[in-house]
Amino acid sequence: MRILFLLFSLTFYLPGYSQRSETVYRTKGDSIQNYYKVLIPDTVSKGLLVIIGGFCGTPIDVMQETKLPETAVKAGYTVVIPYLVDDCSTIDSKNLYQTRLESVIPEVIKSYNIPKDKFIIGGQSLGGHRAMFYTEQAYKANNEKIIKPNAVFGVDPPLNMKRLWDTFTYLLRINFSEISIEESREQLRRFRIMYGGSPSQFPKNYEVASSYYPDAKDGGNAKYLKSVPVRLYCDPDINWIIENRRGSYATMNATDLSGCISQLKLLGNKNAEFVTCLGKGFKPDGTRHPHYFSMLDPEEFILWANKLLEIK
């Protein structure tokens, strides 16, 4: 059944400046998931920036962690922050997120009169992986309904689901950090449901689900980004990982991110960047943590985006 667009929306003005913000709920009676926040510039839109939060990350969470949305809308971009699947209470074993995202993009472009050829997508953690995967499918599929981004970015996203399984297995085994133990136990449970079991049992399922898979030819799905500008941000604070998680470089997302960029460069991508943000990751309360959106510099990002999209 086709999901009706703009079944219900709330509109208000953002405090401090004149841009409007709308929250659009796509399923009648459901305000928990399948919705998105739109930040609307007070000028003609220069382009679309889609920002996806991490695991269970709502639009409000995203706006608390980074000033990128408000910086982008002030610069003239229409900003969309989706929350299409409630990760906290559901397991997206059918990749419903991808299907919903594919339908959201053209609807937003049409509804908010956004230029079709000025589109960047990205996100933090799981959101970065989802942005990468969406972009890969857009360039892989011969389907005009999947709007192709001009560029994609990720802020410390896990890209290789096999490596992530190995990391969770290791953290559970060493039994060091309570936070790591709880997260690892829950994520391994989810992986068993989503992929059928372990990578050794179902290697193809892990390859298909990964946005970068070093065991596959040309990096698996990553090969579809060989002509797409890609930015992967990372705060590779190995000492923090050692002291707080008893991990290593092998347990860090930096392993996937650096490998993916190297693979893209091998494929001839001259616009693939590994952006090092050592020491710049912090929680909204100021606590040091190298896995937060705060590592991205919003002002520098907009300069990059404007240059890439030829926006003055």
Model-predicted segments: where are they?
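Bacterial Sec-dependent N-terminal signal peptides
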Residues: M1-R20
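N-terminal cap/lid segment of alpha/beta-hydrolase-fold proteins
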Residues: S18-T43
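Short substrate-entry loop that stabilizes the transition state in hydrolases
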Residues: V44-K46, I51-T90, I242
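Alpha/beta-hydrolase active-site loop
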Residues: D92-N113, F133
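Primarily recognizes the serine-hydrolase "nucleophile elbow" in alpha/beta-hydrolase
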Residues: K110-S111, K116-N175
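The alpha/beta-hydrolase serine catalytic core
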Residues: D166-P214
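Serine-hydrolase catalytic core
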Residues: I193-E273
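Catalytic active-site module of serine/aspartate enzymes centered on a nucleophile-bearing elbow/loop
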Residues: T287-K312
